[in-house]
A protein has these predicted regions:
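Non-globular targeting/processing and membrane-anchoring segments
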Residues: 1-30, 39, 43-82, 97-102, ...
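Short acidic-hydrophobic, aromatic-tinged amphipathic segments that line or gate anion-handling sites
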Residues: 12, 85-90
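The conserved beta1-alpha1 loop
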Residues: 34-36
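Histidine-centered metal-chelating micro-motifs
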Residues: 92-95
Length: 159
């Protein structure tokens, strides 16, 4: 079950910038898509583009986290790695701190890094619920999560 993460946990971006979770969340709520470090994760890039295409202009920091190295994250995300803030979590400390069991996951953290809500595995309905909550907190339009050609719903992969 997802839980409040450790706000003092150091997290490194694919560009090599390391800050604590608390520092990353200083100004905005966080919308974080945590992908599995598997080739199948590339199929979720269009979903990420739809979600962050709407929420990217809101007072929400849109982040993709891959529990692996920057080279694996870049291989999974392709050009999308240049569009979003990408966190790399090779030791899975962030994933474990959140208490995630299944990936992919969509996580909403408040500015103080407490958990608002999360969806684990790929259920368009559950992810829509999370994005609706993010949009409500940000006073913003809620993105349409599901789309043609998306991966089939799945319980996901072990975190």
């Amino acid at each position: 079950m997802a839980k409040n993460p450790d706000p003092l946990l150091p997290i490194t971006s694919d560009a090599g910038v390391t800050r604590t979770l608390d520092d990353w969340a200083t100004v905005f709520n966080l919308a974080i898509v945590v992908l599995p470090d598997r080739p199948e994760a590339a199929g979720f890039v269009p979903v990420i583009d739809r979600i962050f295409g709407t929420l990217g202009d809101a007072d929400v920091r849109a982040i993709v986290c891959v529990p692996s190295t920057p080279s694996i994250a870049d291989r999974i995300l392709g050009e999308a790695a240049d569009r979003y803030l990408v966190w790399c979590d090779p030791d899975r400390a962030f994933v474990q701190s959140l208490g995630l069991d299944r990936l992919p996951a969509l996580v909403h953290l408040r500015q103080d890094t407490t958990l608002v809500t999360a969806a684990q595995g790929w259920s368009p309905t559950d992810w829509q619920r999370v994005t609706d909550e993010i949009a409500r907190h940000a006073h913003w339009t809620s993105p349409k999560v599901s789309g043609r050609g998306d991966p089939a719903p799945t319980s996901g992969w072990p975190a």
